[in-house]
Curated annotation (Swiss-Prot):
Catalysed reaction equations from the record: (S)-2,3,4,5-tetrahydrodipicolinate + succinyl-CoA + H2O = (S)-2-succinylamino-6-oxoheptanedioate + CoA
Broad class of enzyme this protein falls into: transferase
NCBIfam families reported in the protein's UniProt record: dapD, PRK11830.1
Lineage of origin: Bacteria, Pseudomonadati, Pseudomonadota, Betaproteobacteria, Burkholderiales
GO BP annotations listed: diaminopimelate biosynthetic process; lysine biosynthetic process via diaminopimelate
InterPro entries associated with the record: DapD_Trfase_Hexpep_rpt_fam, Hexapep, Hexapep_transf_CS, THP_succinylTrfase_dom1, THP_succinylTrfase_N_sf, Trimer_LpxA-like_sf
The protein's name in its UniProt record: 2,3,4,5-tetrahydropyridine-2,6-dicarboxylate N-succinyltransferase
Species name: Paraburkholderia phymatum (strain DSM 17167 / CIP 108236 / LMG 21445 / STM815) (Burkholderia phymatum)
UniProt-annotated location(s): Cytoplasm
Keywords: Acyltransferase, Amino-acid biosynthesis, Cytoplasm, Diaminopimelate biosynthesis, Lysine biosynthesis, Repeat, Transferase
Cited Pfam families: Hexapep_2, THDPS_N_2
KW Signal (keyword) present: no
SUPFAM superfamilies: Trimeric LpxA-like enzymes
Length: 275
């Protein structure tokens, strides 16, 4: 079934300029709708780890993008206090008390999750925003005013602190989603965008900005890397001087690495403050 879906969606993507809400074959509409439904249930996901490496299911990302071409904007009620006008309904628009109980997560008003996002058991959504295609795994806290971008992959027992921004793939169009692996802590007002991967058990301090062009400086080795935070890293904001010493530019600094056992025993503040 997935292979047939993929073929229909790949073909539709190649001819996307011909698609509109009023001009789309029935099989394309059905395939895109089914893909979004499976993303919403967590049965399919845009990226998954296989044999230790993250593999992006590009056809599912295409399905998310195609869904915007196939739907018209429509009024959407917002609990009596306002009204929205959009193409993607709320994930919880038709939820009953039984549906919420079966889901096993908390949604604190006015948190928003779009249909096509997956929210696992024991997740807490404080007043925050989770976009279509995102996957938020068990036990994760999405704190107040945090945003989880389209198709972003958030692991188990992650804490996204207040105001954290996790980038999406839709605007601007990105090749790969942001991935935050299990047991990570992302500090307040930090931003992780452009398909950066933060590996498991890492701690990102407050106000750290990570994109594909951000230099990641390892204090222990002196190495500079891009696009990936190694497992167990403790990261703070910093600067690297230019070769001529005339200026410095922003970077992220890996100040230490800890194993999962240390991460579990030691408080976050102690990890960030220690030498």
């Amino acid at each position: 079934m997935s292979q047939q879906l993929q073929q229909i969606i790949d073909n539709a993507w190649d001819n996307r300029a011909d698609l509109s809400p009023k001009a789309a074959p029935a099989d394309v509409r059905e395939a895109v709708a089914h893909a979004i439904e499976q993303l919403d249930k967590g049965a399919l996901r845009v990226a998954e780890k296989k044999d230790g490496d993250w593999v992006v299911n590009q056809w599912l990302k295409k399905a998310v993008l195609l869904s915007f071409r196939l739907e018209d904007n429509a009024p959407m009620p917002a609990g009596g206090y306002s009204q929205f006008y959009d193409k993607v309904p709320s994930k919880f628009a038709n939820y009953t008390a039984e549906d919420f109980a079966a889901g096993g997560f908390r949604v604190v008003p006015p948190a928003i999750a779009r249909r096509g996002s997956y929210i696992a058991k024991n997740v807490v959504l404080m007043p925050s925003y989770t976009n279509i295609g995102a996957y938020v795994d068990e036990g994760t806290m999405v704190d107040t005013w945090a945003t989880v971008g389209s198709c972003a992959q958030i692991g188990k027992n992650v804490h996204l602190s207040g105001g954290v921004g996790i980038g999406g793939v839709l605007e601007p169009l990105q090749a790969n989603p942001v991935i935050i692996e299990d047991n990570c802590f992302i500090g307040a007002r930090s931003e992780v965008v452009e398909g950066v991967i933060v590996e498991e058990n890492s701690v990102i301090s407050m106000g750290v900005y990570l994109g594909q062009s951000t230099k990641i400086y390892d204090r222990e080795t002196g190495e500079v890397s891009y696009g990936r935070i190694p497992a167990g890293s403790v990261v703070v904001a910093g600067n690297l001087p230019s070769k001529d010493g005339s200026h410095s530019l922003y970077c992220a600094v890996i100040v230490k690495k800890v194993d999962a056992k240390t991460r579990a025993k030691v408080g976050l503040n102690e990890l960030l403050r220690g030498d």
